[in-house]
Amino acid sequence: MRQPTPLPRELRLLDTPYLHLLDRVTIDPVFVMGLHRSGTTVLSLCMLATACFNTTTMYNMLYRRCLLHLHLHPQEGAARRKELADYFESRNLVTRTYDGIGVGPDAPEEYGEALGNKGRQPLLNARNLPGFMELARKIQYVDGQERLLLLKNPWNARHFLYLAEAFPTARFVFIHRSPLEIIDSQIRMFASLLQERNEYELLLVDWYGELFEQPWKVKLGQWIYGENSPYLYWKIVRHVTRTCEYMRVHRQALGARAMDITYQDLCAQPLETMRRVTTFLDLQPAREPDYAQFIAPRTRPLLPHVARNRTKIERATARYVEEFGLSSRKP
């Protein structure tokens, strides 16, 4: 089965006649903030289970240019949704493969892939903010303005001050995890994306599909970004340590607009931790979900080069670990 596309190129302006419907649509965003592999997806799934939020999904990300049209023409919208579901089934796509998180047309997806940064880090900025605001309003119009809009893009973890300025009413839920575990998990994740073609990522990332059309580039990428690559290791360590320090230094600038939880607490005490989150957001879910169903922490040895450099990593992130009350991983 062919890969589904949002719409033929010449039809991507189908929403234009309906944009006036967004004039009075407001958004009240809640940003989940944290590094990749810090637990942002698990936290988002727990929050979405309360039925108090809308969010970006695979469906509304792929069809973002015609979302209003498909909503106002339900038969066509249902056909597009079925096309996407059939694609998942034909590829036997049940999870994202690298972390076991389930996928499907209505599964939550990070908004970063809608920002059009063409291979660069998908950061929300002044250039792409208007287009993103339009997408956010479309989602609220289609899915219901009585819910808050939950947004997640770990690439923005080192740029949340801009988000706070761009969205003056936004609130932030930070999730923190041991930097050592984050680094180890990120290396495994990014290396796996080049080890074999990931059909799920093909739907979202144009350059990823183009890369696998050129086998020599794949081989080169596997060498540079392999699980045992010193380059990938140092690149990730640099990114993680810088982001941890940014969060440590600037988190308090958000004041009462933000709260913090740890991945360790979410795994050990999911109900109590999520009650803190819903209380902070002034939410009263009609029922309390079984949050534990989304949590499946894995224990595995650190990669050899991460283990060898453990002391250096812990020294570089010690103030962050202390600031947010994180526990050190046992050797």
Where are these regions (language model features)?
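Short hydrophobic/aromatic-enriched beta-strand-loop microsegments
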Residues: 54-56, 170-178, 195, 285-286
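PAPS-dependent sulfotransferases, especially Golgi type II membrane carbohydrate sulfotransferases
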Residues: 1-24, 30, 187, 191-331
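Conserved phosphate-donor/acceptor-positioning beta-strand/loop module used by diverse small-molecule
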Residues: 152-154, 163-188, 277
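The Walker A (P-loop) glycine that initiates the GxxxxGKT/S ATP-binding motif of P-loop NTPases
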Residues: 33-34, 152
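A conserved segment at the C-terminal end of the G1
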Residues: 41-54
